[in-house]
């Protein structure tokens, strides 16, 4: 079976923004074009970040910030992970799963943005990759479960009590706030004592 490159399934009409655009302007672009992300580029059209709907909710709305005063540079995810258009789609899927992302900006040899590919784009042309994704996700989950916790702390909504926290930790396959984390630790200690 011939391998397909990301360049063959990529969208070429990428909606971009500048680092100085406001959150309102970015949100308007998403709504206007029916998309879930905007790639932030510099004056050379090189991708320097990406803003998703989730970024707007977590970094602006949930913190009560005025979206007219928040600029893209302050809320974009960076550095942005990019690929070249000759990368095979199965490699792109593995990269997405490994990094926990759903879209990859595509750049040319000079680092200039020329397209974007999403997990959905790939699965529409290569549905057989669903099995690959599931396999990679399982490996990823197993690796996470081997760790008692991931040292990275993020902000967001706790998967257990559903309250907003700036100190979420990934434990036992879920993002938890400090209070729920203490509860989990307490349960583990009790379980160990019962086993002894």
From Swiss-Prot:
It comes from the Archaea. Fe cation binds at residues 158, 161, 177, 180. SUPFAM superfamilies: CBS-domain pair. Residues 153-187 form the ACP-type MB domain. The keyword Iron applies. One of its GO terms (molecular function) is metal ion binding. InterPro entries: ACP_MB (IPR044065), CBS_dom (IPR000644), CBS_dom_sf (IPR046342), Diverse_CBS-Domain (IPR051257). Zn(2+) binds at residues 158, 161, 177, 180. The keyword Repeat applies. Keywords: CBS domain, Iron, Metal-binding, Repeat, Zinc. Residues 10-69, 76-132 form the CBS domain. This is Uncharacterized protein MK0525. It comes from Methanopyrus kandleri (strain AV19 / DSM 6324 / JCM 9639 / NBRC 100938). The lineage of its organism: Archaea, Methanobacteriati, Methanobacteriota, Methanomada group, Methanopyri.
């Amino acid at each position: 079976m011939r391998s397909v490159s990301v360049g063959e399934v990529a969208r070429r009409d990428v909606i971009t923004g500048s680092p100085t655009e406001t959150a309102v302007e970015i949100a308007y672009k998403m709504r206007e074009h029916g998309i879930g992300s905007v790639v932030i580029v510099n004056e050379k059209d090189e991708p320097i970040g990406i803003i998703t709907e989730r970024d707007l909710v977590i970094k602006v709305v949930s913190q009560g910030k005025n979206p007219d005063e928040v600029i893209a540079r302050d809320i974009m995810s960076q550095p942005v992970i990019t690929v070249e258009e000759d990368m095979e789609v199965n490699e792109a899927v593995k990269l997405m799963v490994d990094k926990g992302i759903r879209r990859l900006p595509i750049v040319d040899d000079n680092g200039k943005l020329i397209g974007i590919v999403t997990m959905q784009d790939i699965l529409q042309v290569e549905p057989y990759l669903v099995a690959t994704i599931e396999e990679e996700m399982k490996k990823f989950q197993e690796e996470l479960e081997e760790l008692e916790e991931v040292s990275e702390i993020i902000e967001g909504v706790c998967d257990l009590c559903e309250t907003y926290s700036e100190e979420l930790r990934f434990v036992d396959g879920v993002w938890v706030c400090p209070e729920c984390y203490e509860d989990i630790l307490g349960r583990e200690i009790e379980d160990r004592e019962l086993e002894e």
